[in-house]
Amino acid sequence: MPIRALCTICSDFFDHSRDVAAIHCGHTFHLQCLIQWFETAPSRTCPQCRIQVGKRTIINKLFFDLAQEEENVLDAEFLKNELDNVRAQLSQKDKEKRDSQVIIDTLRDTLEERNATVVSLQQALGKAEMLCSTLKKQMKYLEQQQDETKQAQEEARRLRSKMKTMEQIELLLQSQRPEVEEMIRDMGVGQSAVEQLAVYCVSLKKEYENLKEARKASGEVADKLRKDLFSSRSKLQTVYSELDQAKLELKSAQKDLQSADKEIMSLKKKLTMLQETLNLPPVASETVDRLVLESPAPVEVNLKLRRPSFRDDIDLNATFDVDTPPARPSSSQHGYYEKLCLEKSHSPIQDVPKKICKGPRKESQLSLGGQSCAGEPDEELVGAFPIFVRNAILGQKQPKRPRSESSCSKDVVRTGFDGLGGRTKFIQPTDTVMIRPLPVKPKTKVKQRVRVKTVPSLFQAKLDTFLWS
């Protein structure tokens, strides 16, 4: 139940929920409100009477003893009168509310009208400002045009006077003596005439100086052109001499080309002779060796590499170490071997030792690279040799030997040029009886070149597969 007293700071009634404090002047407030007042006020004064207050003069809490109120007996007439009074007050409040609402509506309408008026005035103001800025720009432009017009008039007046003076000077320069004297007489006497004559004299002097400078510049240009002409003639003579030298070099190059064509024809003839020699009997094997030795190696042939047809890696350092005794050249081949030693820088033949197969063998075998093949030679090794060697191996008749007879291969595998500009491997037996050529076919009138296709190895890629021209 609230106490019928209130705090002047917060305007709230005192109750038992909050503490009530008092000051020595007698005024009471909520304790929390009084503390907040002291914290925010510039000085510690009473909120109501404004006297100075100290901390010790504040009573922090007051206690009130309230008695129980007696219940009043209410009368019906009293209640009816109270109800009528309340209804009258309510109707009065409603009337006041309606009047206030009418006033509010009127004020709202007035406010809307004022807002519309303000908007229209703002639009009019914006248009006026835009018109004003446009007029200012036009005025500024007109002022600028007026200034330009004045400047143009001054420039025109100055140019007219200058043009008149220039016409008189031009007439003075181009006219004869009588005309000049007549023009001077027309000028009259006086200060202006003297000034005009002075201007004419100065102009004539400047023109004379300009003519002198132009003549000097023309002389310098003429000297420069003469020097350029002399240097151009010397350069032309140099070019002519270089042209003659180029013609001589062209002739020498044509001669070299003709000699190269002749060399090609001779190589073709050697090739034809080599192919014809392949069909000779065994006694003519020395001719084959001679042609192979006489075939020069191409010195300036730049071979290009391409990928091999197989993915197997090729060991270029692989050698064939075979305990094969060196073969003694025959008396007929001794001359060619001496020639080979003398022309070592041009000779393409290199000895490569080859392994041999030791032990008895039942049938005729070829011992190449440490592999023994009964009946037929190895296709991989046969494909690595030239045509005449393959023909000799394929057409060789293997003599039958007894099983108890043991033989060792005395063949030597050599590497040399095949006569066509490339390298190849071939077998050179110590015994010429081991290599037998194919049987000689009867010659026909029309010679046909037989091309034997080499069988590529199916097991290992060869170095020849990397080379292409």
From Swiss-Prot:
<dbReference type="GO" id="GO:0007165">
    <property type="term" value="P:signal transduction"/>
</dbReference>
<feature type="region of interest" description="Interaction with CYLD">
    <location>
        <begin position="211"/>
        <end position="469"/>
    </location>
</feature>
<keyword id="KW-0677">Repeat</keyword>
<keyword id="KW-0225">Disease variant</keyword>
<dbReference type="GO" id="GO:0061630">
    <property type="term" value="F:ubiquitin protein ligase activity"/>
</dbReference>
<keyword id="KW-0539">Nucleus</keyword>
<keyword id="KW-0863">Zinc-finger</keyword>
<feature type="short sequence motif" description="PIP-box">
    <location>
        <begin position="460"/>
        <end position="469"/>
    </location>
</feature>
<dbReference type="GO" id="GO:0005634">
    <property type="term" value="C:nucleus"/>
</dbReference>
<dbReference type="GO" id="GO:0031297">
    <property type="term" value="P:replication fork processing"/>
</dbReference>
<keyword id="KW-0158">Chromosome</keyword>
<keyword id="KW-0833">Ubl conjugation pathway</keyword>
<dbReference type="GO" id="GO:0005654">
    <property type="term" value="C:nucleoplasm"/>
</dbReference>
<dbReference type="InterPro" id="IPR001841">
    <property type="entry name" value="Znf_RING"/>
</dbReference>
<dbReference type="InterPro" id="IPR013083">
    <property type="entry name" value="Znf_RING/FYVE/PHD"/>
</dbReference>
<comment type="similarity">
    <text>Belongs to the TRAIP family.</text>
</comment>
<keyword id="KW-0234">DNA repair</keyword>
<dbReference type="GO" id="GO:0106300">
    <property type="term" value="P:protein-DNA covalent cross-linking repair"/>
</dbReference>
<dbReference type="GO" id="GO:0008270">
    <property type="term" value="F:zinc ion binding"/>
</dbReference>
<comment type="subunit">
    <text>Interacts (via PIP-box) with PCNA. Binds TRAF1, TRAF2, TRAF3, TRAF5 and TRAF6 is part of the receptor-TRAF signaling complex. May interact with CYLD; the C-terminus interacts with CYLD, however the interaction was not detected with the full-length protein. Interacts with POLK and POLN. Interacts with UIMC1.</text>
</comment>
<keyword id="KW-0175">Coiled coil</keyword>
<keyword id="KW-1017">Isopeptide bond</keyword>
<dbReference type="GO" id="GO:0004842">
    <property type="term" value="F:ubiquitin-protein transferase activity"/>
</dbReference>
<dbReference type="GO" id="GO:0048471">
    <property type="term" value="C:perinuclear region of cytoplasm"/>
</dbReference>
<keyword id="KW-0479">Metal-binding</keyword>
<feature type="zinc finger region" description="RING-type">
    <location>
        <begin position="7"/>
        <end position="50"/>
    </location>
</feature>
<comment type="function">
    <text>E3 ubiquitin ligase required to protect genome stability in response to replication stress. Acts as a key regulator of interstrand cross-link repair, which takes place when both strands of duplex DNA are covalently tethered together, thereby blocking replication and transcription. Controls the choice between the two pathways of replication-coupled interstrand-cross-link repair by mediating ubiquitination of MCM7 subunit of the CMG helicase complex. Short ubiquitin chains on MCM7 promote recruitment of DNA glycosylase NEIL3.</text>
</comment>
<dbReference type="GO" id="GO:0032688">
    <property type="term" value="P:negative regulation of interferon-beta production"/>
</dbReference>
<feature type="coiled-coil region">
    <location>
        <begin position="201"/>
        <end position="280"/>
    </location>
</feature>
<dbReference type="GO" id="GO:0005730">
    <property type="term" value="C:nucleolus"/>
</dbReference>
<keyword id="KW-0242">Dwarfism</keyword>
<dbReference type="GO" id="GO:0006915">
    <property type="term" value="P:apoptotic process"/>
</dbReference>
<dbReference type="GO" id="GO:0010804">
    <property type="term" value="P:negative regulation of tumor necrosis factor-mediated signaling pathway"/>
</dbReference>
<keyword id="KW-0832">Ubl conjugation</keyword>
<feature type="coiled-coil region">
    <location>
        <begin position="70"/>
        <end position="177"/>
    </location>
</feature>
<feature type="cross-link" description="Glycyl lysine isopeptide (Lys-Gly) (interchain with G-Cter in SUMO2)">
    <location>
        <position position="304"/>
    </location>
</feature>
<dbReference type="GO" id="GO:0006974">
    <property type="term" value="P:DNA damage response"/>
</dbReference>
<keyword id="KW-0227">DNA damage</keyword>
<dbReference type="GO" id="GO:0090734">
    <property type="term" value="C:site of DNA damage"/>
</dbReference>
<keyword id="KW-0862">Zinc</keyword>
<keyword id="KW-0963">Cytoplasm</keyword>
<dbReference type="GO" id="GO:0016567">
    <property type="term" value="P:protein ubiquitination"/>
</dbReference>
